[in-house]
């Protein structure tokens, strides 16, 4: 189950404790995307502050897939709040005051909790029937390990800071590393390429964040396909389906893996990002001391900031080389499985949601769509 489901279960258990009801380790939840209630386990619940507050704890279980939220401890603290007449309706949403506690991502520093519409509807369905007439509910979610885990995601690239976002569009986890998810993606690709108005060009975007950015950039003039971590097989499937212009759009921390020949990008299965970056730095002729610092950086973002502070122009060359290498390695990967007439372009964005770099093919394909990367490679040349 996705993170919002486990939050809702703990929230319901805490609200029941606030009402003085006995603890139930199994909470029946009404789900927006299911006809039947779902039983979700909760670890504990208790009243605090002389009965003025209640706290419940659950532990996230995303199922059989590889997910960094596995075992994540979730705390939900609730208390009543008084409402005025026009706030009493469930449709006003004012009855529920959702606070982002420690480890929960917010939209900018000190902003609102980053919560999906599905998560809000889930909370509303399962908590509103418990709230006494004339009262509202203040609900604070705390994820003790949320901030540490968020550092391993690209949340910051999309304005989400200080923790994990409570996102999800359904109860079940969509496992981007699973064979079933790969098959679903390939079937969708075949449907898009078989459409009567298909012009031969397609953009593959990595994850929901990449899809959102692609739409903002105006790339929806050609088919957009959100993919998970199986980049290699999807590239082959695109060639088999007759795609002639394929654009790979992704966060630099993901696409850098392709430059190292890693075409299944889930972090549990393959990483090597800093090693690939260091190898590119060697080929670009960076000083040895700087290359050592790259290899010792805590993250891709830290490495990028360090380089930009020392030599912004060198960063442009390095990342252009990386984008070119992504295109070359993708073409080489495809050539192992057959011979097709397809141009593969690469375009990379950074944590600030800026489209920064593209290889030669990527730049050409973006230009057709009226988009130009911030760091244009036009003046750069590679040995």
Swiss-Prot record:
Pfam families: CbiD. Pathway: Cofactor biosynthesis; adenosylcobalamin biosynthesis; cob(II)yrinate a,c-diamide from sirohydrochlorin (anaerobic route): step 6/10. Belongs to the CbiD family. It catalyses: Co-precorrin-5B + S-adenosyl-L-methionine = Co-precorrin-6A + S-adenosyl-L-homocysteine. Its EC number is 2.1.1.195. InterPro entries: CbiD (IPR002748), CbiD_sf (IPR036074). Keywords: Cobalamin biosynthesis, Methyltransferase, S-adenosyl-L-methionine, Transferase. The keyword Transmembrane does not apply. It comes from the Bacteria. This is Cobalt-precorrin-5B C(1)-methyltransferase. GO terms for biological process: anaerobic cobalamin biosynthetic process; methylation. One of its GO terms (molecular function) is cobalt-precorrin-5B C1-methyltransferase activity. The keyword Transferase applies. It is an enzyme of class 2 (transferase).
